[in-house]
């Protein structure tokens, strides 16, 4: 049962005036001076230190904002992005879903909030939710492929940056805001959010608040797949409902900044509370809380040598408690500080063009602890610092990009009665990148990017030694790991004419020592006993009476990831647009030739969008093919076709108010994502209808 803490009540009442103010504005909009609404331009903030247009970037970047983001918004960050070319999701039930980019997840996909890491523990375990709620996000940038040069080794697979504008970066004159409410869907969601920015042209204040609640997810059949039941005899008991999948959460923020003609300086405080069922176990819930303080400043047009400086920093206090039948079993804490300072220089003239670029310093200091019976990692302090340089050289209509990064990471564990003496590990890393954009003509262009990437192993890859209940394994790390190395190439051909566009790209990444968990032939008792005797086969050790789990070790193996991505947008008739997309990933262990686990199959998608006046309608279909290229102890995942439809209508009133309805899984298919660890005991929701209203002012 969800229990409201006193701190949550204080946060709610502190933000309550925002709801009344917003309601008043919606009902009596003539009281306020009508402001000028500024729409966000579809320009990537992430992986774009020089602020060029998205079409000029060498690396593939997807930008979601405005209406497009609003229509894609889901309960989790992973599901909001799932279906973008190259992006799937871990989908650990409806409440915990992290983005997977090109088959890579966890410590190889960096998730940021306003350019700074979120510092939660979602990369440690699939049942840990990302500490960002999509209801408040204003823009999401997705960088597909290595971005370690700018963001460190944890971005070797890509970057997801959620931008919420809680620190206003531009001048605000008057009152701007939005509100949104959603009801229904397969989980019977009741969600609402409100955002307000108030300013006098120099000083701006931001406030936002949201609340969400869901019930058990309605599913189109049994939670347990037929393949799993046939393979190991797991009974197919739960039908029509995904047990222990409800959730309840709330949060909000307040921020302020001084804005100038050439920059800003500001700060914000935000809080997030989330209580949800883990699905994997019927009696386990996670009660999460995250408090975050941000400061940010940026100034441009400064002088003849250094023309721009930017500083961002965030401090996060994160805690979540795993409740077993209402009793706290294990408590996870992560407290940390992360930030960056970046300076841009004025263009340097050369015989072939003017070189523009930036130099930066990044730093991170986090302390993680897990206290309780199910802790499988000791307390760890991780510190990192890095220097990087990124440069661009335009040559006529073409461009060359290059850069380097040098860093050091220390990962030090504490002494513990359960895990033994503390250990210290340090890693020196370097990352290099060389890219180019060749403009064939006004419509066609080619891009390519070469990179060498190095990543320090994470604390759980080094020091894990215990039962990981969420994965059903006893995980064993290796403190002797060296840094993970990879080399990659990414190439794309792009076409654009007016609003029509098409791109197709390919990539190849080779890891010399890819770190991942692999099943061994051993078993472990929950107390760590190796190969305990279980004469009667009941899954309980005869001597200790403890449960038994298969052992999984973190190993470093040579591996290759390669794939294709394609996307097109075309106007095929008056007011009618066609969208096409597809992706494919192939990943293997080069030592054995085996396929790597949880790799998404070939996916092809298409969508139609019709808009005339205030009316908008969409029909979308995504087909995921059968995935039979499986790793050891991994079951085949059946194909599915996910069809959805949406209609929206803007009311003829002064405020920009839009009503919308979205139907999901119209074919009522059993949708199981191969990238999900829970794919055989949890399925996506059944055919459902979601309705909502949103307003901008």
Predicted regions and their residues:
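Short acidic/polar hinge/loop motifs at secondary-structure boundaries
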Residues: 117-144
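C-terminal beta-signal and adjacent terminal beta-strands/loops
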Residues: 220, 454, 510-512, 517, ...
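Gram-negative outer-membrane beta-barrel transporters
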Residues: 357, 396, 507-511, 532-630, ...
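Flexible loop and strand-edge segments within Gram-negative outer membrane beta-barrel domains
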Residues: 245-249, 262-309, 315-338, 373-375, ...
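N-terminal periplasmic "start-of-domain" segments of outer-membrane beta-barrel proteins
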Residues: 41-70, 98, 106
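Structural signature of Gram-negative outer-membrane beta-barrels, strongest in the C-terminal barrel
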Residues: 258, 268, 378-511, 571, ...
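Periplasmic-side early beta-strands and strand-to-turn transitions of outer-membrane beta-barrels
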Residues: 173, 177-180, 184-187, 191-288
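Outer membrane beta-barrel strand-and-loop segments of large Gram-negative receptors
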Residues: 244-245, 336-342, 386, 478-482, ...
């Amino acid at each position: 049962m969800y229990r409201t803490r006193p701190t949550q009540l204080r946060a709610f009442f502190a933000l309550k005036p925002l709801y009344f103010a917003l309601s008043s504005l919606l009902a009596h909009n003539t009281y306020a001076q009508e402001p000028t609404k500024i729409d966000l331009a579809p320009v990537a903030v992430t992986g774009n230190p020089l602020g060029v247009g998205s079409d000029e970037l060498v690396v593939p970047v997807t930008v979601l904002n405005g209406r497009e983001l609003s229509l894609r918004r889901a309960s989790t960050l992973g599901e909001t992005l799932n279906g973008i070319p190259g992006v799937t999701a871990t989908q650990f039930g409806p409440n915990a879903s992290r983005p997977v980019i090109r088959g890579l997840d966890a410590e190889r996909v960096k998730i940021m909030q306003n350019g700074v890491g979120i510092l939660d523990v979602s990369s440690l375990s699939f049942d840990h939710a990302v500490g960002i709620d999509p209801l408040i996000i204003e823009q999401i940038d997705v960088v597909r492929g290595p971005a370690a040069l700018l963001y460190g080794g944890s971005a070797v697979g890509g970057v997801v940056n959620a931008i919420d504008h809680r620190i206003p970066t531009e001048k605000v004159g008057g009152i701007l805001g939005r509100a949104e409410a959603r009801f229904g869907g397969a989980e019977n969601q009741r969600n609402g959010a409100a955002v307000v920015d108030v300013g006098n042209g120099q000083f701006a204040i931001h406030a936002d608040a949201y609340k969400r609640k869901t019930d058990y997810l309605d599913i189109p059949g049994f939670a347990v797949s037929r393949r799993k039941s046939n393979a190991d005899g797991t009974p197919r008991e739960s039908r029509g409902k995904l047990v222990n999948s409800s959730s309840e959460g709330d949060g909000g923020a307040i921020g302020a900044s001084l804005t100038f003609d050439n920059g800003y300086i500001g700060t914000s405080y935000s809080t997030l509370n989330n209580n949800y069922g883990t699905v994997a176990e019927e009696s386990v819930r996670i009660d999460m809380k995250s408090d975050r303080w941000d400061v940010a400043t940026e100034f441009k047009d400064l002088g003849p040598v250094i023309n721009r400086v930017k500083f961002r920093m965030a401090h996060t206090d994160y805690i979540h408690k795993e409740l077993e039948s209402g009793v706290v079993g294990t408590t996870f804490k992560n407290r940390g500080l992360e930030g960056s300072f970046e300076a841009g220089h004025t263009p340097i003239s050369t015989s072939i063009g003017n070189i523009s670029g930036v130099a930066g310093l990044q730093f991170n200091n986090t302390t993680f602890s897990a206290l309780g019976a199910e802790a499988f990692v000791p307390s760890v302090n991780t510190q990192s610092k890095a220097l990087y340089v990124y440069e661009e050289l335009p040559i006529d209509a073409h461009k060359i990009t290059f850069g380097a990064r040098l860093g050091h990471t220390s990962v030090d564990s504490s002494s513990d009665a359960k895990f033994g003496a503390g250990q210290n590990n340090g890693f020196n890393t370097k990352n290099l990148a060389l890219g180019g954009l060749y403009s064939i003509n006004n419509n066609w262009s080619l891009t390519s990017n070469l990179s060498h990437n190095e990543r320090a192993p994470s604390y759980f890859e080094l020091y894990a030694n215990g039962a990981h209940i969420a994965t059903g394994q006893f995980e064993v790390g290796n403190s002797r790991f060296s840094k993970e190395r990879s080399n990659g190439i990414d190439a794309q051909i792009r076409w654009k004419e007016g609003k029509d566009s098409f791109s197709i790209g390919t990539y190849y990444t080779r890891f010399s020592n890819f770190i991942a968990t692999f099943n061994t032939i051993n078993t472990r008792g929950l107390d760590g006993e190796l190969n305990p005797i279980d004469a009667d086969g009941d899954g309980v050790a005869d001597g200790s009476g403890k449960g038994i789990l298969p052992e999984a070790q973190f190993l470093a193996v040579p591996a290759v990831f390669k794939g294709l991505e394609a996307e097109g947008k075309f106007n095929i008739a008056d007011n009618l647009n066609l969208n096409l997309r597809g992706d494919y990933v192939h990943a293997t262990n080069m030592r054995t030739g085996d396929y790597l686990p949880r790799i998404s199959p070939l996916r092809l998608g298409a969508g139609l969008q019709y808009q005339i006046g205030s009316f908008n309608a969409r029909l979308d279909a995504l087909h995921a093919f059968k995935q039979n290229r499986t790793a050891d102890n991994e079951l085949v995942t059946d194909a599915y076709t996910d069809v959805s439809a949406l209609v929206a209508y803007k009311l003829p009133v002064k405020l920009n108010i839009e009503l919308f309805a979205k139907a999901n899984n119209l074919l009522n298919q059993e949708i199981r994502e191969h990238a999900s660890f829970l794919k055989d005991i949890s399925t996506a929701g059944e055919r459902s209808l979601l309705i909502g209203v949103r307003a901008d002012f």
